[in-house]
């Protein structure tokens, strides 16, 4: 594999992972709030 592909893809992969973690954490928090209110 060409090293330039790795140079281009790795920041995108890091950004996508970071976004998924942040969105996932917010979604879990919101889901827990909704479930907590129903109980």
UniProtKB/Swiss-Prot annotation:
Keywords: Membrane, Photosynthesis, Photosystem II, Thylakoid, Transmembrane, Transmembrane helix. Its main location: membrane. One of its GO terms (cellular component) is plasma membrane-derived thylakoid photosystem II. It comes from the Bacteria. One of its GO terms (molecular function) is manganese ion binding. GO terms for biological process: photosynthesis. The chain crosses the membrane at residues 4-24. Signal peptide: none annotated. PSII is composed of 1 copy each of membrane proteins PsbA, PsbB, PsbC, PsbD, PsbE, PsbF, PsbH, PsbI, PsbJ, PsbK, PsbL, PsbM, PsbT, PsbX, PsbY, PsbZ, Psb30/Ycf12, peripheral proteins PsbO, CyanoQ (PsbQ), PsbU, PsbV and a large number of cofactors. It forms dimeric complexes. Loosely associated component of the core of photosystem II (PSII), it is not always seen in crystals. PSII is a light-driven water plastoquinone oxidoreductase, using light energy to abstract electrons from H(2)O, generating a proton gradient subsequently used for ATP formation. Belongs to the PsbY family. This is Photosystem II reaction center protein Y. The gene is psbY.
